[in-house]
């Protein structure tokens, strides 16, 4: 009598799978929804989810080999350029007029980078589709919650003093996470589902308090359309536009202010901000080399070092705080990262370019340089795209007619 097959159950592997599922559920579902009602949700929940993912990988060892992955990172020019930005930020503590707040800001930056690297190394070599389908589910649920809050916001947020701020940050998170959600659904040929996600996110951003997220989503849509039409052109345009704006940022107020005066008048807030930027560049051209040091752009407005109406964009703050070294290193890192994303994942490339364009537009419009919630949001987007790329291993199932017949036994 044949012996019935026996299966070995490993409780440790089951526990690791459960921890990983909970981690991705928190990262892809709980966090986007909670970010619509709490401005601190991203900073609090993201590290918890990352710890769960790291614990799961430590148990089942399903991640890629650590040292080869670290070696690839350390030999990647764009990664080294990014580390140069971090190093220059640390070195700027020597000449910043606010060493205490700048040290805290640098610690937040380093902690976010370390968290992202640990989560990257902890991601499994092959992602399960069940975990990745949580992403569009969470983005759609968060968009629905945002729509409901914006429609009946007075009743739901009357006891929440940070309601509008949470909605603005939640809208930024939705604009950025919409693209990896669409990328996953398109890679699974769920085009209708991806269209539903885009419509829900666009509806939520239309009702959101600010226009930053909606504008950034529109910029991302243009990058998506261009890359979908012609892959190499879309990647090249996105990389050159982002890196080029970082490089020539000090010239922008001199070019944009006459146009702004002609369109909106000389006393428009945006025109006055450009005038303040012009004055900073003209009065201290030598400081464009080293920058004024970390945290100077924010604290400088409070203590009168900068005009109160100075721009709050990434382009201004990067040059003002880190100078030409930080700006050129950041531009090189961004250019290399965009090209690498377009080369390594052609299926995901249109949505990856859209995410790069969306994030860059958000930074240019007014998020700033290294705000902790913004850095954590960028970290989430990076990890999400890496996870989706590792979920593309499935081959197409062969048709029944293509399976060779077994020879008949005589």
Model-based region annotation:
Residues 20-37, 49-105, 141-149, 248, ...:
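N-terminal hydrophobic segments of proteins, predominantly signal-anchor/transmembrane helices
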Residues 322-360:
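Hydrophobic transmembrane alpha-helices and their immediate junctions
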Residues 10-16, 59-79, 184-196, 229-238, ...:
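Membrane-interface helix-loop-helix junctions at transmembrane boundaries of multi-pass membrane enzymes
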Residues 127-157, 164-229, 332, 336, ...:
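Alpha-helical transmembrane segments of multi-pass inner-membrane proteins
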Residues 48-56, 353-362, 368-410:
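Transmembrane alpha-helices of multi-pass inner-membrane enzymes
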Residues 77-85, 99-122, 133-141, 172:
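Aromatic-anchored transmembrane helix interface
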Residues 60, 87, 148, 207-208, ...:
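A membrane-periplasm/extracellular boundary helix in multi-pass inner-membrane enzymes
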Residues 264-322:
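Long extracytoplasmic/lumenal interhelical loops at the membrane interface
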């Amino acid at each position: 009598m044949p012996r019935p097959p026996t299966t070995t159950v490993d409780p440790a592997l089951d526990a690791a799978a459960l921890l990983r599922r909970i981690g991705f559920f928190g990262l892809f579902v709980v966090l986007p929804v909670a970010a619509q009602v709490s401005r601190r949700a991203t900073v609090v929940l993201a590290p918890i989810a990352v710890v769960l993912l790291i614990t799961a990988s430590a148990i089942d060892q399903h991640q890629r080999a650590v040292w080869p992955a670290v070696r690839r990172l350390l030999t990647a020019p764009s990664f080294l350029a990014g580390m140069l930005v971090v190093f220059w930020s640390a070195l700027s503590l020597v000449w910043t007029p606010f060493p205490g707040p700048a040290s805290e800001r640098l610690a937040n930056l380093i902690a976010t980078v370390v968290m992202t690297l640990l989560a990257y190394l902890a991601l499994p070599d092959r992602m399960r589709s069940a975990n990745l389908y949580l992403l569009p589910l969470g983005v759609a649920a968060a968009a629905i919650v945002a729509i409901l809050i914006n429609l009946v916001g007075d009743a739901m947020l009357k006891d929440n003093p940070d309601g509008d701020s949470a909605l603005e940050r939640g809208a930024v998170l939705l604009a950025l996470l919409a693209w990896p959600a669409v990328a996953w659904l398109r890679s699974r040929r769920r085009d209708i589902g991806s269209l539903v996600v885009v419509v829900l996110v666009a509806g939520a951003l239309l009702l959101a308090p600010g226009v930053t997220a909606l504008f950034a989503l529109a910029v991302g849509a243009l990058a998506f359309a261009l890359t979908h039409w012609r892959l190499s052109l879309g990647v090249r345009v996105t990389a050159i536009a982002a890196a080029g704006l970082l490089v020539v940022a000090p010239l922008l107020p001199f070019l944009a202010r006459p146009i702004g005066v002609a369109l909106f008048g000389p006393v428009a807030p945006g025109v006055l901000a450009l005038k303040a930027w012009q004055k900073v560049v003209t009065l201290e051209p030598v400081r464009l080399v080293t920058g004024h040091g970390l945290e100077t752009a924010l604290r400088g407005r409070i203590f009168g070092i900068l005009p109160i109406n100075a721009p709050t964009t990434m382009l201004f703050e990067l040059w003002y705080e880190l100078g030409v070294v930080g700006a050129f290193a950041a531009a090189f890192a961004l250019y290399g990262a965009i090209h690498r994303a377009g080369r390594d994942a052609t299926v995901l490339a249109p949505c990856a370019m859209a995410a790069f364009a969306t994030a860059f537009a958000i930074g240019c419009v007014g998020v700033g340089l290294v705000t902790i919630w913004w850095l954590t949001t960028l970290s989430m987007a990076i990890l999400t795209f890496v996870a989706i790329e590792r979920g593309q291993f499935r081959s197409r199932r062969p048709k029944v007619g293509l399976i060779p017949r077994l020879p008949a036994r005589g």
